[in-house]
Amino acid sequence: MNSLRRFVTATDAVRFQSPWTLEEWLCRADVVDNKQLLLVRANMEPHRSHPFHKHPTREELIYIISGQGEQWVGKEHRILKAGEMAFIPQGEVHGTYNPFDEKLVFLAILAPSDAPEPGIVDMSKEEPWASLRKDFPAVT
């Protein structure tokens, strides 16, 4: 961690390929000396998803940079386009799906950064979530 870092370039980002997206972590403790926020740029290929899950100890904002995504918050969903966002309250089940033919790029902003574990809980195999998007390909 660089406690003096206040600016983060593309080369400073911590990259990680999750089962859902290529994650580019721009704000977390090993990147900047932050106390409250996490920021990740997520690059989701066409016909992929981050299936239903929840963050028991964090709130989240999803902000679309490019492409469009099918964003679920609870049992509601909307197609979000560039410049649009969704707020996910702490503990709310949600999922991000890209049923489209173009890449989806979005920012996920989570707080607080130092929340206790578990940070994420998979809900995709539990009802009613397992039935809501069962036609979408499973994450491999």
What are these regions (language model features)?
Residues 41-42, 87, 101-118:
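A short hydrophobic beta-strand segment most commonly corresponding to one strand
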Residues 23-27, 40-55:
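Conserved short histidine dyad/triad with adjacent acidic residue
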Residues 75-90:
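Short acidic-glycine-tyrosine-enriched beta hairpin
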Residues 57-59, 63-69:
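Glycine- and acidic-residue-biased ligand/ion/polar-headgroup-sensing regions
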Residues 1-36, 122-140:
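A short, N-terminal "cap"/entry segment at the start of jelly-roll beta-barrel domains
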Residues 51-52, 71-72, 88, 94-100:
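Short beta-strand His + acidic residue motifs that chelate non-heme Fe in jelly-roll/DSBH
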